[in-house]
């Protein structure tokens, strides 16, 4: 749950206008993904991406990521939307991008995947659990294995690593610095300064 949300005040020709900080960032086409990725967070991110596409389908969108990961299907809804919309989505890791956060970081537009220098990036295989009858557990197990194959395939495509290398590296938690993530192919550049 989010605590205090800062507000900013802008002077316009019509007087002062106040925005919550997230609305102000959205005005600059910046979407902030922070915290655990679940259905609620994913719906909010998807809605913002769709809104920004409707506002200007030619202008890039910046997705800033500081996330420990979360639910695979929630993350895949963000991934599919990033690919569905016309604007390029640049991704920027601020702090950490772990699990589904790292996956989404790697899914930014080629040449537009960034990290700040002290951020940490971590990839691993899907986590899950099951209970119930043996046949139900088998169904869930097969679905987790299917999702693992899908995620590894996309990570291999995004990074340029072989599928075998991705499978090996995601077998356990695999942590990288921003520089290591660039060498691995998950990002394109480590940012030192905002050059806007």
UniProtKB/Swiss-Prot annotation:
Q: Which reaction does it catalyse?
A: Hydrolysis of proteins to small peptides in the presence of ATP and magnesium. alpha-casein is the usual test substrate. In the absence of ATP, only oligopeptides shorter than five residues are hydrolyzed (such as succinyl-Leu-Tyr-|-NHMec, and Leu-Tyr-Leu-|-Tyr-Trp, in which cleavage of the -Tyr-|-Leu- and -Tyr-|-Trp bonds also occurs)
Keyword rRNA processing on entry: no
List, alphabetically, the SUPFAM superfamilies matched.
ClpP/crotonase
Q: Name one GO biological process term.
A: protein quality control for misfolded or incompletely synthesized proteins
Gene3D superfamilies registered for this protein in UniProt: 2-enoyl-CoA Hydratase, Chain A, domain 1 (3.90.226.10)
Which residues lie in coiled coils?
none
Top-level taxon: Bacteria
Would I find Magnesium among this entry's keywords?
Answer: no
**Which UniProt keywords are given for this protein, alphabetically ordered?**
Cytoplasm, Hydrolase, Protease, Serine protease
Subcellular localization(s) per the UniProt record: Cytoplasm
Enzyme Commission number? 3.4.21.92
A Pfam family reported for this protein in Swiss-Prot or TrEMBL: CLP_protease
Q: What does this protein do?
A: Cleaves peptides in various proteins in a process that requires ATP hydrolysis. Has a chymotrypsin-like activity. Plays a major role in the degradation of misfolded proteins.
Note the subunit structure.
Fourteen ClpP subunits assemble into 2 heptameric rings which stack back to back to give a disk-like structure with a central cavity, resembling the structure of eukaryotic proteasomes.
The UniProt similarity line reads: Belongs to the peptidase S14 family.
Name of this chain's protein: ATP-dependent Clp protease proteolytic subunit
Species, as recorded:
Helicobacter pylori (strain ATCC 700392 / 26695) (Campylobacter pylori)
């Amino acid at each position: 749950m989010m605590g205090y949300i800062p507000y900013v005040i802008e002077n316009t020709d019509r007087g002062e206008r106040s925005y919550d900080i997230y609305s102000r960032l959205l005005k600059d086409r910046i979407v902030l993904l922070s915290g655990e990725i679940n259905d609620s967070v994913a719906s909010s991110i998807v809605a913002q991406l769709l809104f920004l596409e409707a506002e200007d389908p030619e202008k890039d969108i910046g997705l800033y990521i500081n996330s420990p990961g979360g639910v695979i299907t929630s993350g895949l809804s963000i991934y599919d939307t990033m690919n569905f919309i016309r604007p390029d989505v640049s991704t920027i890791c601020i702090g950490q991008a772990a699990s589904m956060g790292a996956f989404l970081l790697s899914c930014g537009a080629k040449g537009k995947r960034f990290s700040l220098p002290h951020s940490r990036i971590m990839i691993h295989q899907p986590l899950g659990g099951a209970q119930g009858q043996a046949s139900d557990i088998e169904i869930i197990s097969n679905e987790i294995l299917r999702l693992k194959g899908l995620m590894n395939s996309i990570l291999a495509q995004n990074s340029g690593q072989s599928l075998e290398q991705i499978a090996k590296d995601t077998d356990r938690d695999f942590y990288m610095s921003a520089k290591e993530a660039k060498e691995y192919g998950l990002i394109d550049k480590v940012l030192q300064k905002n050059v806007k």
